[in-house]
């Protein structure tokens, strides 16, 4: 059952690209069509600016950004942990993100796995051979494959057991974190 839902999301993203959605929109729309998130259809608007690595800037691949938005639609926070003690509330919020389990461990897998497959996470690098022919067919086919892979990855993470995937080790990250920073630990 789950495998067929993942495949439906992958194929939905491919079809979305053929219909004219940009890379980020393709991934998010495919997930919104197949997963109950409670978000209105208008939520897709948030993805538009991420196309072409943020408005054709060439930064983080729009398909990767779309996958992050899609996974966030399911696992993202809608409220912060509450505690009358401000320090305890901050520590609880940090544990929710950095801890084991922690939400950043889920999101961190997206760019790391895509980089493993494509060698980069930047749109301008992943599509470098088409910089002078942005609208050519080969470029579109390449991006469609990236979009499909990003949608499949997002769906795989969404349908995985949350406790397990939120306890995975961090991949590459800005602080080379492996575990919760000591300053975020309630004891630290």
Regions found by a protein language model. Give the residues of each.
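Acidic-glycine-rich active-site phosphate/pyrophosphate-binding loop
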Residues: 1-4, 28-49, 120-127
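C-terminal catalytic subdomain
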Residues: 65, 75-82
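Long, low-complexity, intrinsically disordered segments
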Residues: 182-188
């Amino acid at each position: 059952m789950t495998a067929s839902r993942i495949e439906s999301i992958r194929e939905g993203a491919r079809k979305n690209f053929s219909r004219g959605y940009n890379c980020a929109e393709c991934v998010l729309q495919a997930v919104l069509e197949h997963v109950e998130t409670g978000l209105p259809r208008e939520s897709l608007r948030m993805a538009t600016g991420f196309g072409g690595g943020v408005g054709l800037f060439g930064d983080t691949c729009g398909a990767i950004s779309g996958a992050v938005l899609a996974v966030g639609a399911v696992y993202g926070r809608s409220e912060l942990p509450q505690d009358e003690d401000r320090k305890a509330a901050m520590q609880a919020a940090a544990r929710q993100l950095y801890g084991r389990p922690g939400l950043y461990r889920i999101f961190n897998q997206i760019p790391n796995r895509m980089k493993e497959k494509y060698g980069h996470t930047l749109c301008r690098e992943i599509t470098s051979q088409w910089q002078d022919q942005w609208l050519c067919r080969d470029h579109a086919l390449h991006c469609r494959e990236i979009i499909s892979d990003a949608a499949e990855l997002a769906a795989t993470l969404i349908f995985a057991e949350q406790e397990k995937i939120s306890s995975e080790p961090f991949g590459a990250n800005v602080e080379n974190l492996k575990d919760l920073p000591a300053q975020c630990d309630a004891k630290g």
